[in-house]
Amino acid sequence: MPKDKYIEIKGARANNLKNIDVKIPQGKFVAITGVSGSGKSSLAFDTLYAEGQRRYVESLSSYARQFLGRMTKPECDFIKGLPPAIAIEQKVIARNPRSTVGTSTEIYEYLRLLFARIGKTYSPISGQEVKRHTTEDILACTRQYSKGTKFVILAPIHVIEDRTLREQLEMYMQEGYARIMQKGEFIRIEDFLETGDENSENKELLDASGEELTQMLKEQNREIFLVIDRASVSDEKDDISRLFDSAETAFYEGDGACRLVFPPSNICYDFSTRFEADGMKFEEPTDNMFAFNSPLGACPTCEGFGSVIGIDEKLVIPNTSLSLYDGCVVCWRGEKMGMWLKEFIRRAEPYKFPIFKPYYELTQQEKDWLWHGLPSEKDREPHDRVSIDEFFRMVKENQYKIQYRVMLSRFRGKTVCPDCHGTRLRKEANYVKIGGKSITELVEMSIVNLSAWFRNLELSDNEKEIAKRLLTEITHRLQFLLDVGLGYLTLNRLSNTLSGGESQRINLTTNLGSSLVGSVYILDEPSIGLHSRDTARLIKVLRELQELGNTVVVVEHDEEIMRAADYLIDIGPDAGRLGGRLVYAGPHSEYPTTDPAEQQALLEKYPESHTIQYLTHHETIDRPSSHRIWNRFIEIKGARMNNLRGIDVKIPLNVFTVVTGVSGSGKSSLIKGILYPAMRRKLDLVADAPGEYTSMEGDVDAIKHVEFVDQNPIGKSTRSNPATYLKAYDAIRGLFANQPLAKQMGFTPQYFSFNTEGGRCEECKGAGYVTIEMQFMADLTLTCEACKGKRFKHDILEVHVAGKNINDVLNMTVNEAIEFFSDEKNQLHEGDFDFCRTIVSRLKPLQDVGLGYIKLGQSSSTLSGGENQRVKLAYFISKEEQAPTLFIFDEPTTGLHFHDIKRLLNAFNALIERGHSLVVIEHNLDVIKCADYIIDLGPEGGDKGGNLVVEGTPEEVAACRESLTGQFLAKL
């Protein structure tokens, strides 16, 4: 390959990279792999992306640069042949309550434009299309009749405010008009004026003006029209020209309105250049009319959120498996309030209301009767009606009594906006339709159904021409969402309810939709949250991106994606200071084959590459020879949150349970939405309301704690670090305070903290650096001149333990610290050994979970999502005496290499051996095959998911043909 076809990186030194030289082929699909902490992200993001972004920003004017993220030059000698770079990282894209899948992918923006351009407005009264008429419409109307048919062109008489009808008619006569039409009769204007002197009714009319005249005509049910012209249907050019002129005149005189009358039957047709119908004025569609983030389009009641504070249905009816008779309506329980229930049942009898049917099985009409009143209630006085709405109206009226105020507060919460019904838009937006559907109906459809609807959409040639570009953008983006396995989502799904994997794939779709060419796309584990079934689809999407003319670089651990890549770069061999070297770089042709001789040659050539060892199956994650036997369990019955279909699930205790299923099958709903909050409430802890379920049975009391271990940062402050999180730093400070010099100087453990005043450097507040804002350039981060980056005052740094001061210890990696504090050769003082043992015991779990490479004082903000999760795991392992706990992990293998997964499984086993229980949501087959018990949900995502497909040991799941997870397990 010619030299210019490579992106050449020389001397990369970011973080732990060891001055490496890397060549990345342009226009190819490249995978960067390696164990966690080996330096993959340092190469891909801190070097490649940072330089690509910096060069782009540097090319802009200084004025534009002040509004953009300012980036420093990465640590490397040079980078050649680098195109503009785009990074798609692992992160939840939005916590904004207004952000949706539609707005994140920009599909909604194109939908808004589509409805503004070709949407047709329909009257909610008659259902007829509302449009501005032109003279062409009048010509088309006349052509319904045979040639020679006579007709009259009329204009409704428009009288301005300070002029009477008499004055207006006299003005018409001066302009040359001779007749008017009223009550189906043609009358000369002068005759009408003369009769006005004799007829008192006409006299009042002639002397009226403006609003008064309009009101009188309305009361008398009269209409008066000015006769503009009389003509007959003809194809002659001159006649058509005359018709157009007369029609224009009629529109002018009639203030935008015109009428055609065909005598003698007097059939009439109304036309208007105003946007109105059925006596209603309509707003012409604009893109802002469909924007819930704009005051022009947002529902005025909920301001575009779709929900308001009101009576929350989930609080009134928390258990939808109960029937009305069984007391599903909580506020109608008890002797006094129960009278409402009895009265409703009595009145509902003629309508055959199913009082014994569970609430969730009621039809929408039956729910409306219960909430808003039976049909017969409309004739009754408000105080004599019986419904949930009327009940709370009564409660509000009695708010001056304390018990009613308390009751009202119990049932208040977020509820669907009563005006827009959760659509977030003004009602006028729903009058505009394309193909019989409004924009709110389209965003409520699943992406699978929406894509099919657009494929079958029939438009006129003119509409196709107008919408051509918009439809292309919409259909391409919808197809991308389908290709990455998100067909079960809807466009109005809130972004802050998506999982990390879903968020990243939506982020990917947004970038794919822009169809840039000649760029470098750098993706951080795009396979997160993807079932093995969907990986092939993801590879297809990445290939499409590459075929546009882009270089696609993925930081990835998925074996299938590694094998699909054109070029593999392995950074390692291990993590932290033991990593940062290039241990393998080669094209697809060099990948491991099934030939043992070739595999052996590859292993000998690249002995340090863990990736090659796993790809050649030289190293493997072994399936356990047996599974733990369990006899205690928690059983959730009737789980119905989101798409769960009332399933009953047993979750065994004291074993390793994995919940599997394709993306959108209901895993998070079951575990994060029901199990976790329900268990917290059982333990009297603060928790969100759990999703719907009938009951939780079994050995619930056997669990004393519940912990949800996610990938959020371990500390809210950038000052938080692994040593403080695992409480090892308390012992380190105690050790330094125990030294003779510290005692002599009166230094307590507080003096060795960089978070409190006393021993820390006050110039940089213990950070070791100061930040200087530079308006047009990247902010300068300078080493603090007072402490020279050592974070503490000089006299604090004089205190040593075995030749190391507090700053030296904070700069040690976990592995170095364990080695240092375990070294028996260190000359320690009385009492120091206890501190050292405590430090080692608290740091050892970090080493066990594969985080031996991170520094003790490393800011938590620099840790990846997977690293944060493993720090939390290490914290729980370090807690010696802990009551039986249920641990819930959400995709703990994120960011983990095969080599790291082995350690993770060992850590899981350590927790179970201490009497704890593990529930893990996971797609990684190496983890799934090691489980004691699998709960597989599906079979598909969204509407086609939510069922319990199979539960049992990995062998039992592998034998189930209906299970997609089982099919992949069977291949192992």
Region locations from a protein language model:
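Conserved phosphate-binding elements of NTP-dependent enzyme cores
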Residues: 1-972
